[in-house]
């Protein structure tokens, strides 16, 4: 499995800011969007382009355009919504699919509760977004679902990943690509990433 830890200074700086213990909901939300945007830039760097002639201000001009790439952005509810606007800034015409999965706090197992997948998913690249890749359970369940629907091309964008989650994802889906802002130390006894960001969903939505 291709794993890319984006080491751009802006990404590292913003993830560092997100680790502040008393960060406000507004600030955390802004940074989640910004880092999501920067990860999208990296994840789409292999898109092919083609030459197209358009009418410029001074007559015809040849420009580069992305070559027929159909994309669906797949936020995992609820925390994935915090990254969605940052991704869509670069691809405002992308379709959005939604998958609802929560992690049982006692068993740490993923529990699906909602899905709405775009049509022609088999023709699209899916960019699955979720702030945290901890145990990997929710991400694996989401990719299982997408593949059952016919999706053949999947990239995963997360803010912070634990080695345990990366290992589990690679074992289940070695054909996907993972882009993250930080690979952290690991999981604590409750299944949270350390040092991590805390509960990203609560911080994005202002709930506890």
Swiss-Prot record:
InterPro entries: PRibTrfase_dom, PRTase-like, Upp_B, UPRTase/APRTase, Ura_phspho_trans. It catalyses: UMP + diphosphate = 5-phospho-alpha-D-ribose 1-diphosphate + uracil. Its EC number is 2.4.2.9. It holds the Pfam family UPRTase. Gene3D superfamilies: 3.40.50.2020. It comes from the Bacteria. One of its GO terms (biological process) is UMP salvage. One of its GO terms (molecular function) is GTP binding. Its cofactor is Mg(2+). Binds 1 Mg(2+) ion per subunit. The magnesium is bound as Mg-PRPP. Uracil binds at residues 193, 198-200. Transmembrane segments: none annotated. Allosterically activated by GTP. Disulfide bonds: none annotated. 5-phospho-alpha-D-ribose 1-diphosphate binds at residues 78, 103, 130-138, 199. Keywords: Allosteric enzyme, Glycosyltransferase, GTP-binding, Magnesium, Nucleotide-binding, Transferase. Pathway: Pyrimidine metabolism; UMP biosynthesis via salvage pathway; UMP from uracil: step 1/1. Catalyzes the conversion of uracil and 5-phospho-alpha-D-ribose 1-diphosphate (PRPP) to UMP and diphosphate. Belongs to the UPRTase family. This is Uracil phosphoribosyltransferase. It comes from Aeromonas hydrophila subsp. hydrophila (strain ATCC 7966 / DSM 30187 / BCRC 13018 / CCUG 14551 / JCM 1027 / KCTC 2358 / NCIMB 9240 / NCTC 8049).
């Amino acid at each position: 499995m291709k794993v890319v830890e984006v080491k751009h200074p802006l990404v590292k700086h913003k993830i560092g800011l997100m680790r502040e213990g008393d960060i406000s909901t507004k600030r955390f939300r802004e940074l989640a969007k910004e880092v999501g945007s920067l990860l999208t830039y990296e994840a789409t760097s292999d898109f092919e382009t083609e030459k197209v002639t358009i009418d410029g201000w001074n007559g015809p001009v040849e420009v580069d355009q992305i070559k027929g790439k159909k994309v669906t952005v797949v936020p995992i509810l609820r925390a994935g919504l915090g990254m969605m606007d940052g991704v869509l800034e670069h691809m405002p015409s992308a379709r959005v699919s939604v998958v609802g999965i929560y992690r049982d706090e006692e068993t740490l197992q993923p529990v699906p509760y909602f899905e709405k997948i775009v049509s022609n998913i088999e023709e699209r690249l899916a960019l699955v977004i979720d702030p945290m890749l901890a145990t990997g359970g929710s991400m694996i369940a989401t990719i299982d679902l997408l593949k059952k629907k016919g999706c053949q091309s999947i990239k995963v964008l997360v803010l912070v990943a634990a080695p345990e989650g990366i290992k589990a994802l690679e074992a289940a889906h070695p054909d996907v690509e993972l882009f993250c802002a930080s690979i952290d130390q690991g999981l604590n006894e409750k299944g949270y990433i350390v040092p991590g960001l805390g509960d990203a969903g609560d911080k994005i939505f202002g709930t506890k």
